C-alpha cells in the first residue's frame, strides 16, 4: 500500500515501483488506485440523502468508495481469477468512465490512495473542528462520524496487504499548491484562480483524516518518506 496527501507523488511512486519490478524481476505489477472506486455522482447523492448530510455529495472520504467492489477486485487478483476488470474514474466529469481496465496477470498488487492504511480517528480528534467546513457544515458531526465508522470496515481491505509506504508532507499548507498544480495538468491549463478557490474548499473534505494520518501512519508504516517544501524527498526511513 502507498498513501500520502494530494500531490504527494504516490501515483508516480507506484509507477516507478511497477517499472522496477518489471525490469529487474520480470514481475507483473497491478496498481489499484482507490480513486477509481469512487461512487458515481448519483450514488453519492443517494448516500447524502440517506445519511442526511450533503457533504457526501463530494467524493473523497471513506463511504464514498465502492468498498465491496474494491475488496472483490483484490480477492480476484490474489486468486488469479483472470481476466479482472477494474473501473476507471474520471475526476473531470466526476463519474466512472464507460470502459474498464482489463487485467490478465498480477504477480504483485499495489493499492494507492490518500486514505489507504489509515486507522479510525480517535474521539477527541474527531470532535475538534479543524476548518470552516466542519464548523459550519458538520456541527453535529454526522458526516465525520459516518466516514470514521466506515473506516473500520476499510480495515478489511487494508489487512489484505502486507507492506505500507507512507509519504509525509512538511505541512498541510503545501497541499493546496500541489493539488492546484496537479489539476492544472489534468485540465491542460496554465492558470485558473477560480479553480484554486474551489480546491481550497475541496481539500477541506480531506484535511482532518490527512492530518490524522500524518500523526499516526509514521508509527505503523514499513517505509516513511518525508518530503520537503519543493515536493522532493527529504528523508526515507525503513523499518
What is the predicted function of each stretch?
Residues 19-30:
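Post-Walker A helix-loop "phosphate-sensing" segment adjacent to the P-loop in P-loop NTPases
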Residues 30-32, 37-93:
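Conserved nucleotide-sensing/catalytic segment adjacent to the nucleotide-binding pocket
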Residues 13, 17:
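Hydrophobic positions on the alpha1 helix immediately C-terminal to the Walker A/P-loop
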Residues 7:
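Walker A (P-loop) phosphate-binding loop of P-loop NTPases
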Residues 10:
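Conserved lysine of the Walker
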Residues 115-239:
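Conserved NTP phosphate-binding and transfer environment spanning the P-loop NTPase/kinase superfamily
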Residues 82-84, 105-109, 163:
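Loop/turn-to-beta-strand initiation segments
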Residues 1-3:
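Short hydrophobic/aromatic beta-strand immediately N-terminal to the Walker A/P-loop
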Amino acid at each position: 500500500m502507498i498513501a500520502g496527501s494530494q500531490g504527494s507523488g504516490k501515483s508516480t511512486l507506484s509507477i516507478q515501483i511497477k517499472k522496477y519490478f518489471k525490469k529487474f524481476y520480470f514481475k507483473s505489477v497491478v496498481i489499484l488506485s482507490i480513486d477509481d472506486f469512487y461512487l458515481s455522482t448519483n450514488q453519492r447523492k443517494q448516500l447524502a440523502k440517506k445519511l442526511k448530510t450533503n457533504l457526501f455529495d463530494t467524493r473523497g472520504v471513506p463511504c464514498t468508495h465502492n468498498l465491496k467492489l474494491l475488496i472483490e477486485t483484490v480477492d480476484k487478483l490474489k486468486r488469479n481469477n483472470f481476466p479482472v476488470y477494474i473501473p476507471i474514474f474520471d475526476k473531470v466529469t466526476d463519474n466512472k468512465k464507460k470502459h474498464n481496465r482489463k487485467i490478465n496477470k498480477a504477480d504483485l498488487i499495489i493499492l494507492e490512495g490518500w486514505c489507504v492504511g489509515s486507522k479510525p480517528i480517535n474521539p477527541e480528534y474527531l470532535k475538534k473542528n479543524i476548518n470552516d467546513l466542519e464548523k459550519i457544515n458538520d456541527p453535529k458531526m454526522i458526516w465525520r462520524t459516518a466516514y470514521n465508522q466506515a473506516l473500520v470496515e476499510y480495515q478489511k481491505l487494508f489487512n489484505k496487504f502486507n507492506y505500507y509506504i507512507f509519504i509525509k508532507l512538511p505541512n498541510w499548507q503545501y497541499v493546496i499548491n500541489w493539488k492546484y498544480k496537479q489539476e492544472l495538468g489534468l485540465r491542460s491549463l496554465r492558470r485558473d484562480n477560480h479553480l484554486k478557490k474551489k480546491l481550497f474548499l475541496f481539500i477541506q473534505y480531506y484535511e482532518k483524516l490527512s492530518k490524522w494520518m500524518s500523526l499516526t501512519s509514521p508509527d505503523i508504516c514499513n517505509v516513511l518518506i518525508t518530503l520537503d517544501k519543493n515536493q522532493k524527498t527529504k528523508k526515507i526511513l525503513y523499518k
